[in-house]
């Protein structure tokens, strides 16, 4: 393996985004995943259905060129609603105005979008069912 070849373990949100960014920059990125490819087998979940995406997450999507793809399916969340015992409800905003919000996106859709982008950029996804990464031999 040379220094331009990078191996990633895990094709979740972070692994898929990192593979995309590395491949876009000319690195040979290979992602190993023990679960089936959700684009073929369907998204299996295991975590919450929706994901709250803040500005830091949008930044990563912008750098990868994916914000335009995800923005139309994101739902703005301005704050949380507190229901008091006396019956009235109160919105506790996440920020001062609508420039300081978080966004709800479907985790499966985001993951599959990131995997598509990684593959389109030249990254390789290798599915190793029922195998785990237990040791790493770093390059000297």
Task: Please state what every model-predicted region is.
Residues 2-5, 54-140:
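Conserved N-terminal helical subregion
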Residues 1-14:
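Beta1/beta-strand and adjacent pyrophosphate-binding region of the FAD-binding site
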Residues 18-27, 60:
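A short, Lys/Arg-enriched amphipathic alpha-helix followed by its capping loop at the start of a domain
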Residues 16, 20, 111-112:
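Short, hydrophobic alpha-helix immediately C-terminal to the catalytic nucleophile
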Residues 9, 23-46:
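Glycine-rich FAD pyrophosphate-binding loop
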